[in-house]
């Protein structure tokens, strides 16, 4: 039966009305959501808030939070960025909504440094990440695995003590970060590859240290191309070019180490190392299998995060002790009472030294190795503290700001280990469950090396404090405590100090 023109016009008009009403409802709904976005600063055209971050983004964001509150929303380029600046805000994102923020956003560091996100740090939360994490926990980073290579840590630290004692004997200052990088890289080399990466502390180990510092610095930059992908190819800041050049250096080093490891396989019969375990168990029930590129990327994670993050906290802690000699003497008195002065500091001593543990917690609080957590991204739209967070929003947790929150910490800019001996703070732990102190992050993507990081800081710092008298060189009038921003928070001026053995000299023999 034919349909009249009037009926067709009526149907068309109804469809048009429905379409416009639908669009209006959608607009009003979206507009109401926008009004519920967290507060934040108004940025510049195109760049958004990028220019507001400056050279010290963690400080700039902490200052913004004083005005806009614990959860902020910034438009950075074409991307939304949510920033959590208090323990409660961090808990909302990293615990309550942990699964929704378990992935990383695309970024130049993952692409150009981490073999296109083939590593454990930047990989999506999925089968490959789970396999890398599992192997790392079982064979190097978990509690049982750490016990298995305790003797390696003791031996390599012995080499470092000898080198430091020799420097002291010759009246030469010790550059703390160089010594720490040398020792930690060799610790990891022994357990991962069955070899010391550096035969002695010198130009080769210092070059490696410089490479690690450069990687942690450039990886922490707010790269314009990450936030305005359409112009990433222009590399306006030169960051991507620097990453590519640095990647070539690391890849050459890792390729050489892998080739040497393969050539020496016959020497490890019956004594497999971490890399042997990874190669032998590089697949899982979900069909994921590790390739050479994944192994290189994993080794890169271990050698960079495993050396730089812990060494920076130890360096900051020693600097604070030199500025606060009363705290240094009290720590040494505690150790002398428990350990004495006729043997070396051992890992088993740590649990008997509450003041040392408090010093380490205070260093984690005031000088977190990672001031802004590695970014995450919202898989779905969600709500936090009554605020709407759109899908695809990047998340930054300001760990530095949380550690200096005056509503949580009394006199937060003061280095005061006693705060962790007080009843209300005594049980606060840096392992990711107490959001007042999360130097390693929290949730599913918490740093895989949390146990190792805490152990190295406590063990190495305790050993250095127990083993030496520490003084600043006579040429240093006032210790520089300025920060240098990056993925890891470095001292702007590396700490150099004069050391004198305070134990019998035979203890320093390697």
Curated annotation (Swiss-Prot):
Gene3D superfamilies: Cytochrome P450. GO terms for molecular function: flavonoid 3',5'-hydroxylase activity; heme binding; iron ion binding. Signal peptide: none annotated. It catalyses: a 3',5'-unsubstituted flavanone + 2 reduced [NADPH--hemoprotein reductase] + 2 O2 = a 3',5'-dihydroxyflavanone + 2 oxidized [NADPH--hemoprotein reductase] + 2 H2O + 2 H(+). Pfam families: p450 (PF00067). Keywords: Heme, Iron, Metal-binding, Monooxygenase, NADP, Oxidoreductase. GO terms for biological process: anthocyanin-containing compound biosynthetic process. It is an enzyme of class 1 (oxidoreductase). This is Flavonoid 3',5'-hydroxylase.
């Amino acid at each position: 039966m034919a349909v009249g023109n009037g009926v067709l016009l009526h149907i068309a008009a109804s469809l048009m009305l429905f379409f416009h009403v639908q669009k209006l409802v959608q607009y009003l709904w979206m507009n109401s959501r926008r009004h519920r976005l967290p507060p934040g600063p108004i940025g510049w055209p195109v760049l958004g808030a990028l220019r507001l971050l400056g050279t010290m983004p963690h400080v700039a964001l902490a200052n913004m939070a004083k005005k806009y509150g614990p959860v902020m929303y910034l438009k950075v380029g074409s991307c939304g960025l949510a920033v959590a600046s208090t323990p409660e805000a961090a808990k909302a994102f990293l615990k309550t909504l942990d699964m929704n923020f378990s992935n990383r956003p695309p970024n130049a560091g993952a692409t150009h440094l981490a073999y296109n996100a083939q590593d454990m740090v930047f990989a999506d939360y999925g089968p490959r990440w789970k396999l890398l994490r599992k192997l790392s926990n079982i064979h190097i980073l978990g509690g049982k695995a750490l016990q298995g290579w305790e003797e390696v840590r003791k031996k390599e630290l012995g080499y470092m003590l000898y080198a430091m004692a020799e420097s002291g004997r010759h009246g030469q200052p010790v550059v703390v970060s160089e010594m720490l990088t040398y020792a930690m890289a060799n610790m990891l080399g022994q357990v991962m590859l069955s070899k010391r990466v550096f035969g002695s502390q010198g130009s080769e180990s210092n070059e490696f240290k410089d490479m690690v510092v450069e990687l942690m610095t450039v990886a922490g930059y707010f790269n314009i191309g990450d936030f305005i992908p359409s112009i990433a190819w222009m590399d306006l800041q030169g960051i991507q070019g620097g990453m590519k050049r640095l990647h070539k250096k690391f890849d050459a080093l890792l390729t050489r180490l892998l080739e040497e490891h393969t050539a020496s396989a016959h020497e490890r019969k019956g004594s497999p190392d971490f890399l042997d375990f990874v190669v032998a168990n590089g697949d899982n029930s979900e069909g994921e299998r590790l390739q050479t590129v994944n192994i290189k990327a994993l080794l890169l994670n271990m050698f960079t995060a495993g050396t730089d993050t812990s060494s920076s906290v130890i360096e900051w802690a020693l600097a604070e002790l030199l500025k606060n000699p009363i705290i240094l003497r009290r720590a040494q008195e505690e150790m002398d009472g428990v350990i004495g002065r006729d043997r070396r500091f051992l890992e088993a001593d740590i649990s008997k030294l509450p003041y040392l543990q408090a010093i380490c917690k205070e260093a984690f609080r005031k000088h977190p190795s990672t001031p802004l957590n590695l970014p995450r991204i919202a898989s779905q739209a969600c709500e936090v503290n009554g605020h709407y967070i759109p899908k695809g929003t990047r998340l930054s947790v300001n760990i530095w700001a949380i550690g200096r929150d005056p509503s949580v910490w009394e006199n937060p800019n003061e280095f005061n280990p006693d705060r962790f001996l007080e009843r209300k703070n005594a049980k606060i732990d840096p392992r990711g469950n107490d959001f007042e102190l999360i130097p390693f992050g929290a949730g599913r993507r918490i740093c895989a090396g949390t146990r190792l990081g805490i152990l190295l800081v406590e063990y190495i710092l305790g050993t250095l404090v127990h083993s030496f008298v520490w003084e600043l060189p006579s040429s240093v009038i006032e210790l520089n405590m300025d920060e240098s921003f990056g993925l890891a928070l470095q001292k702007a001026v590396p700490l150099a100090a004069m050391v004198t053995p305070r134990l019998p000299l035979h203890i320093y023999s390697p």
